[in-house]
Amino acid sequence: MKIAYVVSSKKKCGPNIVILNIVKELANKHEMEIFFLDESDDDVFECVNVKSTQIKKASDLKEHLKRFDIIHSSGIRPDALVVLCKVIYRVKCKIITTIHNYVFQDLYYSYGLVKSLIWGLLWCSIWLFFDKLVILSKNADNYYWFLPSAKKNIIYNGIDDNDCLQNKKCNYRKEFNIPDDGILAGSCANLTKCKGIDLVIQTLTKEHKIYYIVAGDGIEKHNLINLVKARKLHERVYFIDFLDEPESFMSQLDVFLMPSRSEGFGLTVLESTKLGIPVITSNIPIFMELFDQMCLTFDIKNPSTLIDVITYAKKNRLHLSQKFHAIFQDRFTSSKMATKYENVYNNLFREVL
């Protein structure tokens, strides 16, 4: 099969990591190429021997896509361009996209009610033209009840389960003068309202021996810094920039926090579990479905419960990490994910013949 991937850019982000892991697993069996729209400082695909080509206008993409059997896109602009090539330019191929978010919730937390409705409806309309839609969970399948059932496939995300931990570039306990008996918690996120980082900050006090490091950037970062100042937690909560390779940071934590209000999947849950770090998530439906036996949870409507859960995770770290890691290997490896995607590709390819 000849398979093309169309993405917004080559920067490191959740959707691109998913495509990277599919390519890693399947590139030796199929002819593949990655098409991207925007330049970026980093290139998440540089570790795979697959050609990548920048696309600057739809007509260019049309000419390229004529060579392929399957087109797999990710993101609103790539989705729109692929549909344009399929419907307007009559490119004869099968098209598939992965829906990584709860579109109206995700857009609402970033852009407000009006824009979330406008862009959400537009994006959902675009999806109707795809031959297949990959949904990341049963919960998301119910959320997108209005999309045709025959087009939807549920595939859980997965990550490479090989050991890839880099040498420590920074000792975070030493950097921030965190005592040995302090509990070091952390999060990695694009700092938007839906990530729920503020819930953790509002729960912590100076009396707790819990220290919290937030790695990431985003539109909410300034507000979160101000919240830390207002609560006088500058000796408990610290911010560091987005990390291209977060494994070293995660490996130094006692517990990883994922306090999201809304989430499409949560790849960092898998990354932390792979490293043997216990994970605590909010009790939103998507996490309860995916990670019910693989994470601890706290009540998002009563965030004060988080303190007790963090303390429990620290005391039982060894047992929890072993238990959670075994479940990760059983459910969420990239090889399992890629096999399911390949089955979808094969079914579509048979329709092309």
Swiss-Prot record:
Subcellular location: Membrane
Effect of disrupting the coding gene: Loss of LPS O-antigen production.
Topology term for the membrane: Single-pass membrane protein
Alphabetized UniProt keyword annotations: Glycosyltransferase, Lipopolysaccharide biosynthesis, Membrane, Transferase, Transmembrane, Transmembrane helix
Top EC class for this record: transferase
Coiled-coil regions listed in the entry: none
EC number(s) given by UniProt: 2.4.1.-
Superkingdom as given in the UniProt entry: Bacteria
Pathway(s) served: Bacterial outer membrane biogenesis; LPS O-antigen biosynthesis
Entry-linked CDD domains: GT4_PimA-like
One GO BP: O antigen biosynthetic process
Binding positions for UDP per the UniProt entry: N190, E271
Gene Ontology CC annotation, any one: Gram-negative-bacterium-type cell wall
Residue ranges of the TM segments: 116-136
Short sequence motif E(x7)E glycosyltransferase motif: positions: 263-271
InterPro entries assigned to the protein according to its UniProt record, in alphabetical order: Glyco_trans_1, Glyco_trans_4-like_N
A GO term for molecular function: glycosyltransferase activity
Family: Belongs to the glycosyltransferase group 1 family. Glycosyltransferase 4 subfamily.
Role, per record: Involved in the assembly of the O-repeating unit during O-antigen biosynthesis. N-acetylglucosamine transferase accountable for the alpha-D-GlcNAc-1,4-beta-D-Gal linkage within the O-antigen.
Other comment: According to PubMed:32421169, the hydrophopic domain of this protein is likely to play a role in stabilizing the association of it with peripheral membrane or possibly, with the hydrophobic moiety of the acceptor substrate. However, a transmembrane domain is predicted by a program.
UniProt-recorded name of the protein: O-antigen biosynthesis glycosyltransferase WclY
Origin species: Escherichia coli
Source lineage: Bacteria, Pseudomonadati, Pseudomonadota, Gammaproteobacteria, Enterobacterales
Gene: wclY
